[in-house]
């Protein structure tokens, strides 16, 4: 399920098809590219794709991009390869079965896998590896974000062929945090599968609310205030609330 929270709609676009599938990758790219002047720093796609619904799709990164070119990295690629090997070892230890893996850039991967246990424990252990961040886990959701405009990101990750029922995306101009992948939108509702959040606006009392959630054991990966929404939702859902109930809380 996707959730868009907006102060205005200048940086967010979405596509929804009821009862049918469409090329949501290209549709979202066309809309987001028109917003390039609003958000030139990074672009993110949350695509609810036509996967088989049986297996999890995990998108993760082992480092950061430092420029629009997919080969622009801030560490030697051998470091990334080593982290990927550590992820593979951890997956074996956790009992996850990887059915398919794709290397998308020097720092990002897409895995199709079977896993039947607790996703929070799973995610914590994967992210205990230095500089590894899970961008999303879902049976439908695939969350892709990187530096560059919508077309740059679409081409880099070959999203033009992705079909699905709905999608939401964000073109970002960094104002409250750094220009990097971890601060880009959308944010995954860690560790709940198929939940993503995109937001436009500014949150007050970010640091106070962040400390409250961190004291409850919740995880933050960036200093972007919008991530707080995803973490807040996850904390409520962890304690038994439904996404629908939390979404309509005032």
Language-model-derived ranges and their functions:
Residues 39, 193-209:
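Conserved beta-strand-loop-short alpha-helix elements that form
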Residues 204-248:
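Short histidine
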Residues 57-58, 178-182, 207-211, 234:
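Short acidic, glycine/serine/threonine-rich loops at helix termini
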Residues 22, 52-54, 175-178, 204-206, ...:
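Flexible loop/turn segments at secondary-structure boundaries
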Residues 1-7, 12, 250:
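Single conserved hydrophobic/aromatic residue that forms the stacking wall/gate
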Residues 76-96:
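Short amphipathic alpha-helix segments
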Residues 31, 141-196, 240-248:
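Conserved mixed alpha/beta core segments that line enzyme active sites in large multi-domain catalysts
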Residues 8-75, 104-112, 117-143:
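Extreme N-terminus nucleophile/cap motif
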């Amino acid at each position: 399920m996707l959730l868009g929270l907006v102060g205005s709609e200048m940086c967010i676009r979405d596509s929804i098809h009821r009862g049918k599938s469409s090329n949501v990758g290209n549709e979202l790219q066309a809309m987001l590219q028109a917003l390039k002047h609003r958000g030139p720093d990074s672009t993110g796609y949350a695509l609810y794709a036509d996967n088989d619904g049986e297996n999890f799709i995990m998108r993760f990164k082992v480092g950061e991009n430092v420029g629009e070119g997919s080969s622009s990295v801030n560490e030697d690629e051998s470091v990334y390869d080593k982290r990927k090997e550590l992820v593979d070892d951890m997956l074996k230890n956790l009992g996850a079965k990887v059915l398919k893996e794709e290397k998308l850039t020097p720092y990002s991967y897409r895995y199709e896998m079977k896993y039947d246990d607790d996703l929070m424990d799973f995610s914590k252990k994967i992210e205990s590896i230095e500089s590894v961040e899970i961008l999303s886990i879902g049976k439908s959701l695939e969350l892709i974000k990187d530096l560059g405009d919508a077309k740059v990101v679409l081409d880099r990750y070959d999203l033009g062929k992705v079909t699905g029922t709905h999608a939401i995306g964000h073109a970002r101009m960094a104002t409250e945090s750094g220009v990097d992948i971890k601060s880009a939108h959308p944010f995954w509702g860690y560790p709940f599968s198929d939940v993503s959040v995109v937001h436009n606006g500014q949150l007050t009392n970010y640091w106070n609310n962040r400390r409250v959630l961190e004291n409850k054991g919740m995880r933050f990966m960036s200093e972007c205030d919008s991530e707080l929404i995803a973490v807040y939702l996850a904390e409520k859902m962890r304690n038994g609330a439904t996404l629908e109930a939390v979404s309509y809380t005032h």
